[in-house]
């Protein structure tokens, strides 16, 4: 077999061949102290802004859960308000703060996130610090008949704001979990069986800061979703388990409207929850489209 030989130019020559050019001799300052700071130049910029910052920031975190501390990967959105006489914020300070907390080995909890939001506002010299964090939460689930266990996961959310002027923190937590839903209409009109599908439950709950400590909100929201569904999902099912899971769903038919109302009732009874949003979306097994229903409720206004 013959081997051809290619005489390659040097790497620097190859870069030049494909368009690289040498740096020019610059005239602008290279020292930070001598550079123009556009963001902090005071001027009337017409409007104050509710929020400005960065999103889709992936970062490893330790999360405080009733089962113990879990290590996971979270997605952050870090923002602050912006006063009218400033062009922008110093966005590098946002990831600086996140890295500083990571280096200190912090554990994510509602309290530590309030502290984080407060420090954001102080560091950025703005009225309000805001953050949203999302991550997968893992928990153990046993099969309904055999008791065999496996890991399940739900998508968890914290949304926290802290206002420096009022000293008030707002904490909203959320959870997205999948369930089984069985159609009541299909069960009612059919001689046998009924169509069922996977439902996606989204819950967001505003917490009362004075009573949220010690509240196992993940378990509470998970139970509100699953206990009102036709049936929960399971990672491990043997034949006796599958039989029981199917029967449980048949015994508890639910429309999306039913799901939302039943979950809302559970949330209404939780004294730690001051407002909530619930959505149910079913991937209909006999249609191309999804079925959806939602409710937004504030106990302080709507009661």
From Swiss-Prot:
EC number(s) given by UniProt: 3.5.4.16
Catalytically driven reaction(s): GTP + H2O = 7,8-dihydroneopterin 3'-triphosphate + formate + H(+)
InterPro entries recorded: GTP_cyclohydrolase_FolE2, GTP_cyclohydrolase_FolE2/MptA
Positions bearing the site annotation: May be catalytically important: 183
Keyword match Transport: no
GO molecular function, one term: GTP cyclohydrolase I activity
Pfam families registered for this protein in UniProt: GCHY-1
One record GO biological process: tetrahydrofolate biosynthetic process
First-tier enzyme category under EC: hydrolase
Family: Belongs to the GTP cyclohydrolase IV family.
Record-linked PANTHER family: GTP CYCLOHYDROLASE MPTA (PTHR36445:SF1)
Function per UniProt: Converts GTP to 7,8-dihydroneopterin triphosphate.
Name under which the protein is recorded: GTP cyclohydrolase FolE2
Designated gene of the protein: folE2
């Amino acid at each position: 077999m013959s081997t051809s030989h290619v005489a390659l130019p040097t790497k620097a020559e190859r870069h030049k061949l494909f368009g690289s050019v040498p740096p020019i001799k610059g005239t602008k300052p290279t020292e930070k102290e001598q550079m123009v700071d556009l963001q902090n130049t005071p001027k009337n910029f017409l409007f104050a802004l509710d929020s400005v910052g960065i999103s889709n920031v992936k970062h490893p975190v330790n999360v405080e859960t009733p089962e113990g501390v879990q290590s996971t990967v979270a997605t952050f959105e870090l923002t602050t308000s912006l006063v009218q006489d400033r062009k922008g914020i110093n966005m590098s300070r946002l990831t600086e703060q996140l890295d500083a907390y990571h280096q200190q080995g912090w554990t994510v909890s509602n309290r530590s996130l309030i502290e984080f939001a407060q420090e954001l506002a102080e560091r950025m010299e703005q009225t309000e610090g805001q953050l949203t964090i999302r991550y997968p939460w893992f928990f153990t689930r046993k099969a309904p008949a055999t008791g065999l266990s496996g890991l399940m996961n739900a998508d968890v959310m914290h949304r926290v704001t802290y206002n420096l002027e009022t000293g008030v923190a707002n904490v909203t937590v959320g959870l997205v979990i999948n369930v089984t839903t069985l159609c009541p209409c299909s069960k009612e009109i059919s001689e046998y069986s009924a169509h069922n599908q996977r439902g996606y439950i989204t819950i967001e709950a505003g917490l009362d800061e004075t009573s949220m400590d010690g509240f196992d909100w993940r378990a509470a929201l998970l139970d509100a979703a699953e206990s009102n569904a036709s049936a929960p999902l399971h990672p491990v099912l043997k034949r006796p388990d599958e039989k029981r899971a199917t029967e449980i769903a048949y015994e508890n038919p639910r429309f999306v409207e039913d799901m939302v109302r039943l979950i809302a009732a559970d949330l209404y009874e939780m004294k730690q929850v001051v407002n909530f949003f619930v959505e149910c979306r079913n991937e209909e097994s006999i249609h191309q489209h999804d079925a959806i229903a939602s409710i937004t409720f504030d106990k302080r206004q709507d009661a």
